[in-house]
């Protein structure tokens, strides 16, 4: 191999690495990490809200594991007109104006869940929610567009309400409210916000 050829190959390799770095930085810049439970072993307490506030007997808990990840689990009961369990993060303003969707990385149990967001901290504040299905035992990434979130209050859809305002997100969480009694388990790796509702193509 000539000196000129070797130099050219090194130049091409350098350009390739530079391009890869630019691509990785671009992808990183297009997302904002809200919670990464792989690196987070301590966090302001997440709040459990179950149907016992309305006389139900469903139970749940939220655990941040020391070896990485978080688990939202429990038992849904339909007794006493109950049937839901939920958890939400501690209040804290997230300005997500430059984003268009939430990205959640998790492993479910085949049940249907809802990802929730609040833009106010009051007890009577509306709860914005977007449903997603899980596949039992499979790691999945769900991209939930802000425009698909529905304003609700105590399980009822609100009409005449503005869409989810990404500039004023105060907390996020998970809700299970399908009419199916029994245990549930959701393993969560991370919660992020992204500019693209569609997953970026691999370089």
Identify the meaning behind each predicted range:
Residues 22-203:
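Beta-rich carbohydrate-recognition modules and glycan-binding surfaces
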Residues 13-23:
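Bacterial N-terminal signal peptides
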Residues 2-14:
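Bacterial N-terminal signal peptides that target proteins for export
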């Amino acid at each position: 191999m000539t000196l000129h050829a070797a130099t050219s190959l090194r130049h091409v390799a350098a350009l390739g690495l530079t391009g890869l770095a630019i691509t990785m930085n671009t992808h990183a810049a297009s997302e904002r990490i809200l919670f990464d439970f792989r690196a987070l072993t301590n966090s302001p307490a997440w709040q459990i809200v179950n149907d016992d506030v309305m006389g139900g007997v469903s139970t749940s808990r939220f655990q941040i594991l020391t070896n990485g990840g978080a688990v939202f689990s429990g038992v849904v009961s339909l007794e006493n007109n109950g049937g839901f369990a939920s958890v939400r993060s501690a209040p804290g303003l997230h300005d997500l104006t430059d984003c268009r969707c939430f990205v959640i990385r998790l492993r479910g149990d085949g049940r249907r869940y809802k990802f929730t967001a609040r833009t106010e901290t009051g007890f009577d504040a509306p709860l914005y929610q977007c449903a997603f299905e899980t596949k039992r035992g499979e790691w999945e990434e769900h991209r939930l567009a802000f425009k698909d979130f529905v304003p609700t209050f105590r399980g009822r859809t609100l009409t005449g309400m503005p869409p989810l305002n990404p500039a004023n997100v105060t907390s996020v969480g998970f809700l299970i409210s399908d009419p199916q009694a029994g245990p549930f388990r959701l393993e969560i790796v991370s919660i992020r916000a992204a500019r693209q509702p569609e997953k970026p193509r691999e370089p």
